[in-house]
């Protein structure tokens, strides 16, 4: 069974009402995980994330592991929302990415 088929099966089993509420819960847990990682591993912003993963980056900590888990949970829920709403977000994502790139270009001109 592919990931897309699993998403459809899970969506069909639980329905929009239950899964939309679960999505809200998972997003709240992600918010908390981001905050804990920022606070405990990045010393409230005093430590910057490296541009690329390397041996100095604290990837082997419970806050990092929890953050990765919560990102996965939210991604799964968002795929279910796409399934429920019969939508393809890719064109919207592309449009928004392009808009942000334009903003960055405009910032560098000033």
Give the predicted meaning of each segment:
Residues 1-71, 75-110:
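Flexible "arm" and connector segments at domain edges
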């Amino acid at each position: 069974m592919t990931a897309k088929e699993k998403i459809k099966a899970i969506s069909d089993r639980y329905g929009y009402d239950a899964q939309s509420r679960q999505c809200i819960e998972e997003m709240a847990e992600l918010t908390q995980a981001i905050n804990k990682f920022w606070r405990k591993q990045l010393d409230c912003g005093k430590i910057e994330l490296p541009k690329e993963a390397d041996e100095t980056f604290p990837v082997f900590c419970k806050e990092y592991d929890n953050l990765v888990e919560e990102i996965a949970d939210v991604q799964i829920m968002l795929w279910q929302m796409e399934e429920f709403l019969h939508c393809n977000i890719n064109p919207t994502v592309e449009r928004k990415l392009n808009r942000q790139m334009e903003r960055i270009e405009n910032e560098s001109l000033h």
